[in-house]
Amino acid sequence: MTKRAFLFAGQGAQKLGMASDLYAAYPVVKETFDTASRILGYDLRELIDSNEEKLNQTRYTQPAILTTSVAIYRLLAENGIIPDIVAGLSLGEYSALVAAGALSFEDAVALVAKRGEFMETAAPAGSGKMVAVMNTDPSLIEEICQQASEKGVVTPANYNTPAQIVIGGEIAAVDYAVELLKEAGAKRLIPLNVSGPFHTALLESASQKLAAELETVAFNDFDLPLVGNTEATIMKSVDVKALLARQVKEPVLFYDSIATIQEFGVDEVIEIGPGKVLSGFLKKIDKTLPTHNVEDQASLDALLNA
């Protein structure tokens, strides 16, 4: 019996027209988008298909990716493909909560629209930067970030793979950390095109607003295990609100989360949502783990015929 993990895509994976073929072909996908549009008060499908500028603004990106991901999840469930364990990268954690039965889709849509707004306000475009540091010892990166903190906020934000760690924070501090990392022998440092320095202390105000918002939402018990980003452990219902509030300002422990999923005995991973970013990380973490992604009709067919 296959033990299957679903991984849900995070911000940055969005693209114009994502899942438009699935929307046209499957009622469950269309219904999911229609529900989201009703809650948001604008036509989400139209925005995804025709307004790239808005699609890349955090307050719109987040409900767009969540809705695309949950629609694909529901389509897979209709085809009898269901997970034994779930996780999501940052924003993707909200899709994972829906899949795990802990959060209604309607509440998730309203919540991530607010989350996107809070994050945009806390870290407006141009207020900070993020840089991927390749093939460098994680403890050296942590040490150098601490050193560079004399210039402002800079910390590891995403532990994507053991060979790719993203640092983020205030521009002067990140630039200084990059300088120190180069002096220490780091060869590949890639500035990222992101809306803001997410998963750093600069998101403190967003974290506080989100904590207040989360108090108004009812969470249910989990139907299946979910590995959370912030501690890379299986989330307990009692901790969900606190962990989600922390998640926006603390690093994402992605490769540790994958280790937890592997301890669960998973032998197949399906990435859900636009792009193949997480599948790419997985290949770097453990290339023996069978991985699929589902984002459109072609990738759905490939999975169903595998």
Residue ranges with predicted function:
Residues 219-228, 241, 246, 250, ...:
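Cys-dependent protein tyrosine phosphatase-like superfamily
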